A protein has these predicted regions:
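Conserved pre-ATP/AMP-binding loop-to-beta segment of ANL
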Residues: 93, 98, 112-132, 139, ...
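Conserved AMP-binding/adenylation subdomain of ANL enzymes
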Residues: 151-168, 176-216, 230-231
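Conserved AMP-binding/adenylate-forming
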Residues: 5-51, 174
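Short hydrophobic alpha-helices that are characteristic scaffold elements of the AMP-binding
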Residues: 35-40, 62, 177, 188-189
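ATP-dependent adenylate-forming carboxylate-activation enzymes
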Residues: 24-25, 42-60, 72-77, 172, ...
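Conserved structural elements of the adenylate-forming
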Residues: 1-4, 124, 129, 143-164, ...
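Structural core segment of the AMP-binding/adenylate-forming
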Residues: 11-12, 39-109
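Gly/Ser/Thr-rich phosphate-binding loop
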Residues: 189, 214-219, 229-286
Length: 286
């Protein structure tokens, strides 16, 4: 799928060094598109799905984005600025149904392209991605990363959490963020499976871990707290799920109360636990 995306982008005039934006919710197409962009030598530019129309317009111009992949959730926000953003820019719709008039349909366009690998040479010193950080004030700040940094994040994460081929990573946070993607990179480099989950309710998370046989789960503090509250109230029962294979729970992106981890260990004493800290500027978690 990534190769088809890359061939499609080359056919549509994308060249090494171009910037290609991704404005999509977590979905099966997200990662093939991301790697398809990288395979062309262009820079992938993930955008925060919470951005309002003016922030989207700002980021498109700041990063000099010439192509934008977007999902159905963003049609309204893009329509509001379509007159400003369609000039000299290709917009590609990724989703079901008919595409908006200002875009072309990705699935219909890319499905017949070759799945063969491209012969485009890319080095660690080539730029590979631009990520946006919220900063402390004003509009988002752009951060430029090389392919070597992306590769380093794979090795760093795998060394940190010890992913192996038989591990299954449950990815809940948004893929536009360096945290979610770089945690997933540990699975990528080890050949392990990843499961994308839309939903943060305790029963939804536990069901996914059980049915998909997940071994590693990255949670945020509110999600972990909700699971503990649901267990304490009896709203969910551990015995209803197959969780023996779940070996690691880690949390990041915010301070983690000591009591939360102590309470977690009461219900999941066999879990390894890790508190993550990372920055978009340093290409994700450490």
């Amino acid at each position: 799928k990534a190769n088809r995306c890359a061939h499609y982008l080359l056919e549509r005039g994308v060249h090494p060094g171009d910037k290609v934006g991704i404005l999509m919710m977590n979905c099966l197409e997200w990662l093939p598109i991301y790697f398809g962009i990288l395979k062309t030598g262009a820079l992938a530019v993930p955008l925060n799905f919470r951005y309002a129309s003016d922030e989207i317009d700002y980021c498109l111009n700041l990063a000099d984005i010439s192509v934008l992949f977007f999902g159905p959730e963003f049609i309204g926000r893009l329509e509001a600025i379509s007159d400003k953003i369609i000039a000299h820019r290709l917009l590609i719709y990724v989703g079901e149904g008919h595409e908006p008039t200002f875009s072309e349909n990705y699935v219909m366009s890319a499905m017949n392209y070759s799945s063969e690998n491209l012969n485009i040479e890319i080095s660690d010193d080539d730029y590979g991605a631009i990520y946006f950080s919220s900063g402390t004030t004003g509009f988002p700040k752009a951060i430029l990363h090389k392919h070597g940094a992306l590769m380093h994040s794979c090795a760093c994460e795998q060394n940190h959490h010890g992913q192996k081929k038989d591990d299954v990573f449950l990815c809940i946070p948004p893929l536009y963020h360096t945290g979610a993607k770089m945690h997933w990179f540990g699975s990528l480099i080890s050949g392990g499976k990843a499961v994308l989950l839309r939903g943060t309710k305790p029963e939804t998370i536990l069901k996914a871990v059980s049915e998909e046989k997940c071994t590693i789960v990255w949670l945020l503090v509110p999600w972990a707290q909700d699971i503990l509250v649901a267990l304490e109230k009896g709203d969910v029962n551990i015995k209803d799920y197959h969780l023996d294979q779940w070996r690691l729970m880690h949390i990041g992106a915010q301070p983690v109360p000591k009591k939360l981890i102590e309470d977690w260990k009461k219900y999941f004493p066999h879990h390894d636990y890790d508190t993550n800290y990372g920055l978009s500027e340093s290409i994700g978690p450490g």
